[in-house]
Amino acid sequence: MDWPIMQIQSLLLKPMFKMKSLLVAGLMMSGFVFGQRINSDTLKVAHDDGLIVYANKPYPLSKKGQVFAFFGWNRGAFSNSDIHFTGNGYDFQLNNVSARDRPTKLGIVYIDPSWFTVVQYNFRAGYFIKDNLALVLGIDHMKYVMNQNQTVDFSGTISDPKYAAMVQNGQVNLADEQFLTFEHTDGLNYENLGLEKYKNLVHKKNVDLIWSYGAGLGFMFPKSNVKLFGNDRSDRFHVAGMGTDLRSSLNLVFWNHWMIRAEAKAGYINMWDIKTTLNNKPDKARQDFVFGQVLAGIGYTFNTKKYN
C-alpha cells in the first residue's frame, strides 16, 4: 500500500519544484532589472512620505518654469512705402519710397559690450508658462535707411517756393539730400512680446535640436534721423507706432544649457507719429511697410525648478 502513495507524492511534488524554480528565476531577473543604474536622463525625487519616484529629466526648452536668454545680430529687408509729411506750410506724400538696412562692418564692435548698440542686434528673454509654450520678451534693433539715390512720385502741397520748385512733373529727386534725408538708424526699435511653441526634433547625449514658431506684437520706439527742408535734424527716441510679426527658429542646445539660435521672421510695421523736428511742433510723418529679418546668436537656458 505504501508504494502507490509514494508515487502520488512524487507526482505532486514535481510540479511544485518546477513552480519554485520559476519563482526563484523570476525574482532573480526582477532584481537584475530593478537593480540597473537609472538612465542619466532621469531624476530621483524624494517625497515627504519617504517614497522615491523616478521621473524623466525634462528636455531643454520644453518644460514649464524653464527660462532662456539670447543675444544675436540681424539683417533686415523692407518693402517700399508711402511716407506722408505734415507740418507748418506743407502737407504732402512721397510714394513708393525704397529703403535698406545698414549693417555694421564686421569687427570688434560685435563683441565689445560698450559698442553693442551700434550693430543691428536682437535680445530675447523667455519663460515657459506651460510645457512647450514660452512667453518671450524681445528687442529687435533694426536699422532703416531711405535710399538717397532715387526719384519718387509726389502729391500734395508745399508753401515754401524753394522746395516746391524741386518738384518736377509730379516727382522729386532726393539724390542731393537738400529736400529730405530720412532714416531710423538708432534705430528701428521693435519692442515686442510674443508666444512661441517649441518642439524637440533631435535628442542626443549633450545635444538637442529644437524648432519653434510663434507670433509677436509690440510698439515701435525708433530714434529717427530726419532732416526735412534744411531744418535742424530730428534725432530722438519716441513711441511712433506698432508692429506685429510671425517668427520661426532652430535652436541647438549643448549640455542642456548653452544654445545657438537661428531665426527668421516677417512682419508689418505702422508708424503714424514719426517726429521730423527737434522741437514740440506738430510736424510729423507717417508710414507703414512689411519687413523681413534673419538673425543668429547665442544664449543660455536653465530650469527654475530644482531637482534632487
Outline where the language-model segments fall.
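Bacterial Sec-dependent N-terminal signal peptides
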Residues: M1-K44, N308
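Short glycine/proline- and aromatic-enriched beta-strand/turn motifs that initiate or cap beta-hairpins
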Residues: R37-Y127, Q293-L295, G299-Y307
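Extracellular loop and loop/strand-boundary signature of outer-membrane beta-barrel proteins
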Residues: A55-K57, I108-I111, E177-E183, L228-F237, ...
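Gram-negative (and chloroplast) outer-membrane scaffold detector with strong preference
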Residues: P60-G65, R124-K227, G299-T304
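Residues that define the transmembrane beta-barrel architecture of outer-membrane proteins
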Residues: K63-V67, T117-Y121, T185-E191, L209, ...
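Outer-membrane beta-barrel translocator domains and adjoining extracellular loop/strand segments
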Residues: S81-G87, Q148-F154, K223-D232, D273-K281
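Predominantly the C-terminal beta-signal and adjacent terminal strand-loop region
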Residues: S81-H84, Y90, S249, V253-N308
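Flexible, solvent-exposed coil segments and beta strand-coil junctions
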Residues: S98-L106, N169-E177, S224-G230, I274-N279
